[in-house]
């Protein structure tokens, strides 16, 4: 007796239903969504588990949705609900980019509230780490755990020099036909250069529905916010009682690694991870190790 012909449409529907239960599996294919925050549309991508405390990725200077390493996003999404987003005025999100970290933190909280989350974990990289610290200080009940990568405290060593360093490396990248992140995020050793090229290649894996690049005006306003953060008086980090994982490379040229040691010393419940022969983007260079450590931290 002949079997029934293969139902391709039915199989596709079943696969879509299964994907809905487990969540989108790959950042490469995660759809870009939008949510109204007051009168501004914020764009975001969501993947991983459909339930549980979400991990909100808070981005770096010039960073949009496409600037997160897919190995890090997919690795954490294997066990958690992950959400990346463009803050106000960045990428495809509307509005004007704030020129202060405090305003960026308020916008991030408003975005989280718009998605109706009562509690989240934060992964803040670089500028996103500044923002994450303020959120934990100002709305402590919203935050369960925090990962601070390639970042530093208010008034931290060398943060006021980020603007100069960024422009110099962008100019060098233009002359040498490189992505600026190859210079800003990685060491100039043979290994660092190799890892930088691999990272930039991974950022190009997504070919459809890519985000908009940051505008020059938004870039300048972000730099203004970073410079002001570097000029601030040190804040009392003892009030951040949540568990914190601090991670960085041992040779961060943007936010000097000394700031990571300072954070780990001043935060009451901090764990420090420093990666060898790595720079500002140490969590991307050592993505396999970082994902293991992040999953252990978030799951403990």
Describe every region a protein language model picked out:
Residues 272, 278-291:
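Catalytic histidine-centered segment of alpha/beta-hydrolase-like enzymes
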Residues 40-94:
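Conserved HGGG/HGGXW glycine-rich cap/lid loop of the alpha/beta-hydrolase fold
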Residues 251-255:
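Acidic catalytic loop of the alpha/beta-hydrolase fold
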Residues 124-128, 132:
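Gly/Ala-rich beta-loop-alpha elbow adjacent to hydrolase catalytic centers
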Residues 240, 246-248:
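Short beta-strand/loop motif that positions the catalytic acidic residue
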Residues 137, 144-176:
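Flexible "cap/lid" loop of the alpha/beta hydrolase fold
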Residues 179-231, 235-236:
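Conserved alpha/beta-hydrolase catalytic His-Asp/Glu region
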Residues 83-123, 292:
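Active-site loop/oxyanion-hole signature of alpha/beta-hydrolase fold enzymes
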């Amino acid at each position: 007796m002949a079997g029934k012909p293969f139902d391709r449409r039915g199989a596709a529907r079943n696969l879509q239903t299964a994907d809905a239960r487990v969540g989108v599996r790959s950042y490469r294919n995660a759809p870009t969504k939008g949510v109204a925050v007051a009168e501004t549309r914020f764009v975001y991508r969501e993947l991983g588990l459909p339930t549980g405390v979400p991990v909100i990725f808070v981005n770096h200077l010039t960073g949009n949705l496409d600037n997160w390493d897919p190995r890090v996003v997919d690795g954490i999404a294997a066990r958690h609900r992950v959400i990346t987003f463009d803050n106000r005025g960045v990428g495809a999100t509307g509005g004007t980019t704030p020129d202060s970290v405090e305003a960026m933190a308020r916008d991030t909280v408003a975005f989280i509230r718009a998605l109706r989350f009562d509690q989240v974990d934060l992964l803040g990289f670089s500028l996103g780490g500044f923002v994450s610290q303020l959120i934990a200080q100002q709305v402590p009940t919203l935050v369960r755990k925090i990962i601070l990568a390639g970042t530093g405290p208010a008034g931290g060593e060398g943060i006021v020099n980020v603007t100069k360093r960024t422009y110099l490396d962008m100019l060098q990248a233009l002359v040498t036909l490189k992505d600026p992140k190859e210079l800003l995020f990685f060491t100039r050793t043979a290994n660092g250069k190799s890892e930088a090229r691999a990272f930039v290649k991974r950022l190009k894996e997504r070919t459809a529905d890519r985000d908009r690049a940051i505008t020059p005006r938004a870039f300048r306003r972000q730099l203004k916010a970073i410079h002001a953060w570097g000029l601030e008086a040190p804040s009392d980090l003892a009030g951040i009682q949540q568990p914190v994982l601090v991670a960085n490379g041992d040779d961060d040229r943007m936010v000097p690694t000394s700031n990571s040691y300072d954070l780990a010393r001043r935060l009451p419940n901090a764990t420090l991870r420093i990666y060898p022969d790595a720079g500002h983007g140490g969590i991307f260079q050592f993505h396999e190790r970082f994902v293991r450590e992040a999953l252990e931290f978030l799951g403990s």
